[in-house]
From Swiss-Prot:
The lineage of its organism: Bacteria, Pseudomonadati, Thermodesulfobacteriota, Desulfuromonadia, Geobacterales. Belongs to the CheD family. It holds the Pfam family CheD. GO terms for molecular function: protein-glutamine glutaminase activity. GO terms for biological process: chemotaxis. The keyword Hydrolase applies. This is Probable chemoreceptor glutamine deamidase CheD 1. Transmembrane segments: none annotated. Keywords: Chemotaxis, Hydrolase. Probably deamidates glutamine residues to glutamate on methyl-accepting chemotaxis receptors (MCPs), playing an important role in chemotaxis.
């Protein structure tokens, strides 16, 4: 399957979870049908984790700005609309089915003082997009002033979020549902 230039391939062995992991950067996404952890770090950006709850096929995107931009010939996954379409299309190519998709939304921190709250707009976009497509949202961790590191295990549907605070790291467990 052709994965395209925005498909994250930066894989490594994650010692925290003792499994293979893929790190995604802004403007990238990853989708998988294997037991792979997907990881990213977010400030004002948003990551949406989507999985087929029956098959365990799932993935994560990482977009920087809400809505659409670019030309029709060159849409960019740095923008929410294209990031969501790329991820959902790839999940379906792997065998995921729209009626069984569910989502978790993370990020949208207000990490830079005095700047327009792009994080809030990013989160609003994600939640509106998912509602319009009737994809249920099972967990949300957005806002606040801290960056986050997000770990997503599509096979189980579990997500782990670590808020990155100056001088300490507080861990949160998000999304107990499988």
């Amino acid at each position: 399957m052709h994965t395209g230039r925005y498909f994250a391939k930066n894989s490594y062995y994650d010692r925290t979870f003792n499994k293979q992991a893929v790190k995604i950067l802004p403007g990238e996404y990853h989708a998988t049908d294997s037991d792979t952890m997907i990881v990213t770090v977010l400030g004002s950006c948003v990551s949406v984790c989507i999985r087929d709850r029956l098959s365990g096929i799932g993935g994560m995107n990482h977009y920087m700005l809400p809505g659409e931009a670019g030309t029709d010939e060159s849409p960019s996954p740095r923008y929410g609309t294209h990031a969501m379409e790329l991820l959902i299309d790839h999940l379906i190519q792997l065998g995921g089915r729209l009626p069984y998709l569910e989502a978790k939304v993370f990020g949208a921190g207000r990490v830079i003082n005095g700047v327009t709250d792009v994080g809030e707009r990013n989160a609003e976009f994600a939640l509106r997009y998912l509602e319009e497509r009737e994809i249920p949202v099972t967990a949300v961790d957005v806002g606040d002033i801290y960056p986050r590191k997000v770990y997503f295990a599509p096979a189980t549907g579990r997500a782990f979020v670590r808020q990155i605070r100056t001088g300490s790291i507080d861990s949160l467990f998000i999304g107990e549902s499988s």
